[in-house]
């Protein structure tokens, strides 16, 4: 094995191994030994690469996010594209959300999401935030995260085109959201619900 861990080389193997293992059992039942053996690693190499199952979740999600960031130019397109990676790995993420490790995944999603909305603000030349705007940023992303989690945990499958429509046609624009104090997380979730009723069979 190489001295340095190259996530670009090993993460596709991790994806494949987890998908196979989670077809038979749940995430909580997986051990470092079972994951390492399915990937073809020694336990020592697994611990060097990920430290533990929590670090594996963080690295897995950040790897999927980074793949989207590298492809598109605007933050909004980046985020939409990374949602598709999550949906493509639905079995893995659904199992994690159903496990005792769910809080860790919520945390890393939330942290990534805040970076996303701040990057989008900078892209749109919104250089600073009032306290009220910062609070609404958090509501905005919590609404988006709720949509993503409900999609993964539910039976619906959103295509890339459907995700585009949700963001562009049904959720308030980012700048309008910063200005409009009446826009809340409940309003965003209401718009998502109405979209589902109209478009998802």
Residue spans for each PLM region:
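Basic, helix-initiating cap at the start of DNA-binding domains
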Residues: 1-25, 29, 34
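Alpha-helical structural segments
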Residues: 12-20, 38, 55-81, 111
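Core of compact, soluble alpha-helical bundle domains
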Residues: 23, 27, 31-36, 50, ...
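Short hydrophobic/aromatic patch on the recognition helix
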Residues: 40-50
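Hydrophobic alpha-helical connector segments
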Residues: 69-96, 101-102
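Secondary-structure edge/capping motif, primarily at the C-terminal ends of alpha-helices
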Residues: 93-96, 121-124, 151-155
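Amphipathic alpha-helical packing segments from all-alpha helical-bundle domains
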Residues: 102-149
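C-terminal peripheral helix-coil segments that are non-catalytic and often amphipathic
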Residues: 153-201
């Amino acid at each position: 094995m190489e001295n340095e861990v190259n996530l670009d080389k090993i993460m596709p193997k991790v994806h494949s191994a987890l998908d196979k293992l989670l077809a038979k059992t749940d995430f909580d039942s997986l051990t470092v030994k079972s994951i390492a053996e399915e990937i073809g690693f020694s336990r020592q190499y697994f611990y060097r690469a990920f430290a533990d199952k929590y670090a594996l979740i963080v690295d897995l999600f950040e790897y999927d996010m980074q793949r989207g960031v590298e492809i598109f130019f605007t933050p909004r397109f980046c985020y939409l594209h990374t949602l598709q990676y999550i949906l493509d790995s639905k079995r893995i993420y659904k199992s994690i959300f159903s496990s005792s490790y769910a809080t860790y995944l919520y945390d890393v999603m939330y942290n990534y999401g805040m970076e996303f909305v701040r990057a989008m603000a900078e892209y749109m030349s919104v250089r600073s935030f009032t306290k009220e705007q910062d609070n609404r940023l958090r509501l905005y992303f919590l609404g988006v995260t709720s949509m993503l989690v409900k999609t993964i945990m539910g039976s619906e499958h959103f295509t890339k085109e459907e995700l585009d429509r949700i963001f562009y046609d049904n959720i308030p624009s980012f700048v309008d959201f910063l200005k409009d104090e009446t826009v809340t997380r409940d309003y965003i979730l209401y718009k998502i619900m109405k979209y589902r009723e109209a478009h998802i069979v």
